[in-house]
Every structure is written in structure tokens, then in C-alpha cells.
Design a protein with these regions (language model features):
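Short, small-residue-biased leader/transition segments that mark boundaries at the very start
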Residues: 1-5, 572-576
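Loop/helix patches that line or flank the sugar-binding groove of alpha-linked glycan CAZymes
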Residues: 356-529
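C-terminal beta-strand-rich structural cap/linker in extracellular carbohydrate-active enzymes
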Residues: 546-567
Length: 578
């Protein structure tokens, strides 16, 4: 009949597609498995607090020639499988990941997105990927042949396999909160006005800030999300999921997803952003906001409180934090150090101690959004020398990595990643505009990792590496419950409130961590017993016994460890220092 309205669309459940994701493909997934795929075991991670997450964009990782990756693999999934990569003697790419000691790679979106034309690779287009088109298909621009539906699947499995073989888990950044297209999306073409939230006036609500938001509270949208996540977790052996704008999803759906992932593997990480990009019509008490965290206690949330206390407010580039001279940041910082759970020594407002358990706190001071930590310090501490700013950066790293919760680091942060911005014609350079604070579609000049910086700032990398090794070496830095945090983490008294120190103690093991935000030496006290300097401001150890007190250098963090003793009838001997 002439009044029948016909639409053509790719299946919303399509798991493979052709170039640019316009047409679905039927694929035998068994034929896409790399050799040895079935034999590779997933890395073990008992608890989120045992993870050290490293955020990577597939293209950034290897696009620059300094990556040492084969030219045809640069910017592609398969770059992660290139072995032995170096730049002038320093490890790059996967060799770098192994050397640093992180446990998980968090990949910015690799699901098929709309804003790079896969048929024109010579245009060198770039996008972070938060523009979802097909939720169950892989992005083709990261494959060596976007026209072959199997190619991207096989090559992404090679990426996963290469990381798993080296004991590194894979976290996917998933963007179920909106679609890039609204009326033209596969959701609307398949079942109009169901998969998206609609306002009372019939318009699309826009809690994402991207033109629409999906309706996770609708039964079939919820089912779609669960089915999709189960597919990624089983077919690709994914080890974790990070939810973009997670607060747009209703709490009930978030909890059901956690239950479903537990059935596959309870060690799968699940965390997300506890905020939205705009106003949603769903009542705030039903949404997975950070302040509702006690209603979904098994899911992690980005800790913007500790982020801003460390380096200053994100949206004012000149704003300073604890490491760069803000003397009012120490209170918020203490809460973050204790995993953002209620602590017997912190008598602040309930919302400040927002986490139900320390496993919920994703501690960070840099991610793909906004200025890198180094660029932020170059703006807010522009009058300080580079050497002083390096001290600030290392102090920030110590706070993130040694706090209770799950540490999260951006690719290249460990060697002072910078995102230089290309100025527009006629634009005069100033303190702020020479750095990109929103590089979502900036070229490789801005976004790609320049591995020569690792060579240039090797001492910074070595410090991050030493911090990660220290964290992984003792469960005291990785406590799972608020009860443990309250029993075994004690803030120590200092005459100066801005000098922060705390003691971690259990079963005869004792650490004292001190943070000095001043430009001069500061003295700190020690508990009873003999200690040695486990980690100095360079990441090194000094076995000389110390008792009573110690001096912390300017703008530095240091860690002391009590020397264990073994008692015999007439003799007490120190045990081996480690």
C-alpha cells in the first residue's frame, strides 16, 4: 500500500559490519580466532583495589613513528601485538606496559562509531569515539582492512590476546547513554520513540549533551545493554567495562548488569562516570549518580573530589591544588586517601565521604578529558621552573597510586604527557590556548604519544613504576572494606595541617606515608620502632635505620617501612629489608 512507510536499517544486534557500519554482516566467529586464542587465560584480579588501570586510545598508542611499531600497524589494533618495540633504547607500546607494571589497559571506545570515515584512511581523521553507531560491532578505522568484516574482529582479538599473554586485562569504554544519530539511529529506525527517553512534549531528552539519551529503564533497552555486555565479555574475553556518563542509567539496570557480569566472571571490573552531561527526565534518585553510590556498592565511580584536590579545579586552568600551592585542599585530600569512605578521624559532611566501600573509588588526576596533569601544571604553576613542576607531578602520582581505592592513570602521564594545540589562523598564543583541553577530534600532532618524552623524562617514569611496584607489594595499600580502612589506616598528627601523613599497620607490617606540599623541608614523626626509607622522592630505597622522626624534602612524598624484628630468648635481630 502507498501509505506504508519503509525504512532500511542495520540490525541493532548486528555483531559484524562492513565499512562505516552501514550494513551488517553474518560471520562465523570461530573463524576469527587467532591461533592459540582458546588457550590464553584471562589475568586474575581478585578485587578492583588490586587493579592499576592505564587509559589508552588505540590510535594514540602507536600512531607516532617513535612508537617503534611497523608502519602498517601504527594506530591499529595489531600494534598492541608488536613485540620488542623501542625508541632509542627505551621500551614503547606493549613493552612499556609490561615495564610499568599496570594490571589493566582501559581502551577508549572501540565499538563502531560514526565520526571517522573508514573508507578514507588517507584523511587522517581522528576521534575519541564517544559517537556510537553500532554497539556490538568494532570500529573499523583501527583495523588494517575496514572492508573485511572479519578483519577488525580478528585483529582486536589479537590485541586482547597479546595483553592477556602478558598478564594485562582489557577494559572497554562503553557508551550506551546516547546514540550519535537520533532520528537516523538504528534504534529509532527499528522502533521509534522506545530506546530513547522522550520528554512530555514529544521531543528527545538530552541528558548526554549530545542530542539524546537512551532509556535504560525501558525493559528492552535494559535487555539490549545486558545482551551486548555479555557478548563483549564472552566473545572477546573482556576484563572490565567503564560506563560513559553512567548517571544517565538507572540504578536498577546498573545493579542487574553487575549481577549478570558476576555470572560470567565476578572479577570483571565495572566503573563509570557518576554524572550526566545535562538534565534527564528520570528522577535523580533513580539514576546512578555518585551521591547515590550506596545503592550500587559493587560498581566504581570516578573520584573527581580527589582529582580536583590534587591539581585544582578542572574547568579553571589557573586553579591550584594541593601539589601546586592550594593550602585549602588537605581536608578533601585526606578523604580521598582513605578511599572516600566514612573514616573515624574525618568528621566531615556525609557527601564528602561518598563511597560505600573503597572499591568504589576510582582515584585519578588525569584522563582523556581536559588538560593533562602536566599541561595543567604548566598553566597553573607557570612561574615555577620545570624541575619544580616535575616534583608537583610526582607528588600527584604518589597520592593517586598510594591512596585506598583503584588508581587510574592516562597513557603517557608517567612521562609528562602534553597535548600541544594547533592555533587557528590569527589566534595569538597565550598561557592556556597553546594546550588542548578537549582533544576529542584533534590530529595526531596533539594526541599521539611522543615516546621520545619517555627518554627525556625517564626519572618520572621510574618513579611511577616504583610507586606501582610498592602498591602491588602490600595489601595495606589495597584494602577492600571500610572496616579494614578504619582499623588499619590512621592519620598522624602534624602541627601543620597541610603536611599530610598516615600510618598503615596490620599484622606487624607498618608503613608511614608523608606528603610535603611546601617548597622547604618539613619534619614528620614516626611511631615506635625502627624504620627505613622504603621509597624516597626518586622512587629509591635507603636501608639506613631511622627512628623518632624524619625530614620530607620539598614538594615530595616519601614512604617509610618499619623494620620487622625476630625475637629469640636473648637476642632480637632485624629481618631482611624489602
Amino acid at each position: 500500500a502507498s501509505d506504508v512507510y519503509k525504512r532500511q536499517t542495520i540490525d541493532i544486534y548486528a555483531k559484524a559490519c562492513g565499512v562505516n557500519g552501514n550494513v551488517g554482516a553474518v560471520v562465523n566467529f570461530k573463524t576469527t580466532d587467532p591461533e592459540g586464542w582458546d588457550k590464553v587465560k584471562k589475568p586474575k584480579c581478585r578485587n578492583a583495589c588490586d587493579a592499576v588501570v592505564y587509559e589508552c586510545h588505540v590510535r594514540d598508542f602507536s600512531a607516532d613513528s617513535s612508537s617503534g611499531v611497523a608502519p602498517e600497524h601504527r594506530g591499529k589494533y595489531v600494534a598492541f601485538a608488536d613485540k620488542g618495540t623501542k625508541y632509542q633504547g627505551v621500551n614503547t607500546c606493549i613493552e612499556h606496559l609490561k615495564e610499568l607494571g599496570i594490571t589493566h589497559v582501559h581502551l577508549l571506545p572501540v565499538e563502531d562509531y560514526a565520526t571517522v570515515d573508514e573508507s578514507k584512511p588517507w584523511l587522517n581523521q581522528y576521534n575519541w569515539g564517544y559517537d556510537p553507531k553500532n554497539f556490538n560491532c568494532l570500529e573499523g578505522s583501527y583495523s588494517t582492512d575496514p572492508y573485511d568484516p572479519k578483519c577488525r574482529i580478528r585483529e582486536f582479538k589479537q590485541l586482547v590476546m597479546a595483553l592477556h599473554e602478558n598478564g594485562i586485562g582489557v577494559v572497554m569504554d562503553v557508551v550506551y547513554n546516547h546514540t550519535y544519530y537520533t532520528e537516523e539511529s538504528a534504534f529509532e529506525r527499528s522502533f521509534p520513540y522506545y530506546y530513547h527517553r522522550i520528554r512530555n512534549d514529544g521531543s528527545f531528552s538530552n541528558g548526554s549533551g549530545c542530542g539524546n539519551e537512551t532509556a535504560s529503564n525501558h525493559m528492552m533497552m535494559r535487555k539490549f545493554m545486558i545482551d551486548s555486555l555479555r557478548f563483549w565479555a564472552t566473545e572477546y574475553k573482556i576484563d572490565g567495562f567503564r560506563f560513559d556518563l553512567m548517571a544517565l542509567h538507572d540504578i536498577e539496570t546498573v545493579n542487574i548488569i553487575r549481577d549478570e557480569l558476576n555470572k560470567i566472571d565476578p572479577q570483571i571490573l565495572m566503573y563509570g562516570e557518576g554524572w550526566t552531561g545535562g538534565e534527564s527526565p528520570l528522577p535523580a534518585d533513580r539514576l546512578a549518580y555518585k551521591w547515590n553510590s550506596y545503592q550500587f556498592g559493587r560498581v566504581g565511580l570516578f573520584n573527581d573530589n580527589i582529582r580536583d584536590s590534587i591539581k585544582g579545579g578542572t574547568f579553571n586552568p589557573y586553579d591550584k591544588g594541593f601539589v601546586s600551592g592550594n593550602r585549602n585542599a588537605a581536608s578533601t585530600l585526606r578523604r580521598g586517601i582513605a578511599g572516600s569512605v566514612p573514616h573515624y578521624q574525618i568528621n566531615d559532611a556525609k557527601e564528602a565521604c561518598w563511597a560505600f566501600e573503597p572499591t568504589q573509588a576510582v582515584n585519578y588526576c588525569e584522563a582523556h578529558d581536559n588538560n593533562t596533569l602536566w599541561d595543567k601544571l604548566c598553566i597553573s604553576a607557570k612561574n615555577d621552573s620545570e624541575g619544580v613542576r616535575i616534583k608537583m607531578d610526582k607528588l600527584a602520582a604518589a597520592i593517586v597510586i598510594l591512596s585506598q581505592g583503584m588508581p587510574f592513570i592516562q597513557l603517557g602521564q608517567d612521562f609528562l604527557r602534553s597535548k600541544p594545540r594547533i592555533l587557528k589562523e590569527g589566534e595569538a598564543p597565550n598561557d592556556v590556548n597553546i594546550y588542548s583541553h578537549d582533544s576529542y577530534n584533534a590530529p595526531d600532532y596533539t594526541n599521539s604519544i611522543k615516546w621520545n618524552r619517555k627518554l627525556e623524562y625517564k626519572e618520572v617514569f621510574e618513579y611511577y613504576k616504583a610507586l606501582i611496584r610498592l602498591r602491588k607489594g602490600s595489601p595495606l595499600f589495597r584494602m577492600y572494606t571500610k572496616e579494614d580502612v578504619n582499623a588499619h589506616l590512621h592519620f598522624m598528627h602534624n602541627d601543620d595541617w597541610n603536611c599530610v601523613s598516615w600510618k598503615l599497620e596490620k599484622d606487624g607490617e607498618c608503613y608511614v606515608i608523608a606528603l610535603n606540599p611546601y617548597y622547604e623541608n618539613r619534619g614528620f614523626g614516626l611511631p615506635e620502632g625502627s624504620f627505613y626509607l622504603r621509597l624516597d622522592e626518586s622512587g629509591k630505597m635507603n636501608k639506613q635505620p631511622v627512628s623518632g622522626s624524619f625530614v620530607c624534602p620539598p614538594l615530595s612524598a616519601v614512604v617509610y617501612k618499619r623494620i620487622k624484628t625476630v625475637s629469640y630468648t636473648h637476642l632480637t635481630l632485624p629481618t631482611k629489608l624489602e
